[in-house]
């Protein structure tokens, strides 16, 4: 497997196809995750999204904040995203490694959504502390993963991606307990409600954990 699956194999048009699903339940998951963040925005926030892909979530949230910056490791994603976001003047997508963040400014809201802790292969507790360093006083970080109640729909969605040739064939002997493994080496883990609570507690920051739509689990960390 290549070092970064999303940068090398699942980017731009291929990543766009991931979200063109035939499953209404999966579409509701996409919408509910965004809606949870949106209800915390008042229109004045400076927002950063980590692992933003081609800007799918950015486009939905841009009307609800002052401006939104997204970073992604893939130049192809950013090139595709510039066209995707062409009519969104307060959104900017840039190439940056989420493990080597280079910002002089801080943000009111930092997002790490769509199971980003797994996709970016982070050490969750260490990365939460890095994220909080990007937040202005009074700001929040939103980190999401999958609810255990969404497992069957999530698995069907990943089978759909494999059938489209976007992922390798799913290895059903190894796929279990919130972890999806493909025969091409791709692996997607999960942070459960219990995991998120443990991370939040160990971080030392004010936090809450919420299940949304029985599809997402959110860790919301506040910087005072």
Regions found by a protein language model. Give the residues of each.
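Conserved class I S-adenosyl-L-methionine
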Residues: 1-42
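Class I SAM-dependent methyltransferase "Motif I" SAM/SAH-binding loop
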Residues: 51-53
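Class I SAM-dependent methyltransferase SAM/SAH-binding core
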Residues: 56-100
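A short acidic, Gly/Pro-enriched loop at the edge of an enzyme's catalytic core
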Residues: 102-110
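A short SAM/SAH-binding and catalytic strip from SAM-dependent methyltransferases
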Residues: 109-123
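A short glycine-rich, Lys/Arg-flanked "PGG" loop and its adjoining helix->strand segment in the class I
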Residues: 125-137
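SAM-dependent methyltransferase
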Residues: 142-199
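Core SAM-dependent methyltransferase catalytic element
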Residues: 211-224
């Amino acid at each position: 497997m290549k070092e970064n699956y999303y940068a090398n194999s699942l980017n731009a048009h291929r990543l766009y196809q991931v979200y063109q699903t035939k499953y209404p339940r999966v579409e509701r998951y996409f919408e509910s995750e965004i809606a949870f963040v949106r209800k915390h925005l008042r229109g004045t926030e400076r927002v950063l999204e980590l692992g933003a892909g081609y800007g799918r979530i950015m486009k939905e949230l841009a009307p609800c904040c002052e401006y939104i910056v997204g970073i992604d490791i893939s130049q192809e994603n950013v090139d595709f995203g510039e066209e995707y976001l062409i009519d969104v003047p307060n959104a900017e997508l840039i190439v940056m490694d989420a493990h080597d963040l280079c910002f002089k400014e801080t943000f009111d809201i930092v997002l790490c959504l769509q199971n980003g802790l797994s996709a970016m292969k982070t050490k969750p507790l260490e990365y939460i502390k890095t994220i909080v360093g990007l937040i202005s006083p009074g700001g929040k970080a939103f980190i999401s993963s999958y609810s255990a109640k969404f497992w069957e729909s999530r698995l069907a969605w990943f089978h759909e991606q494999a059938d489209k040739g976007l992922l390798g064939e799913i290895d059903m002997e190894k796929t279990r307990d919130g972890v999806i493994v493909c025969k091409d080496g791709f692996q997607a883990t999960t942070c459960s409600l219990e995991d998120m609570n443990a991370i939040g507690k160990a971080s030392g920051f004010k936090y809450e954990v919420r299940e949304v739509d029985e599809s997402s689990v959110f860790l919301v960390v506040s910087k005072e």
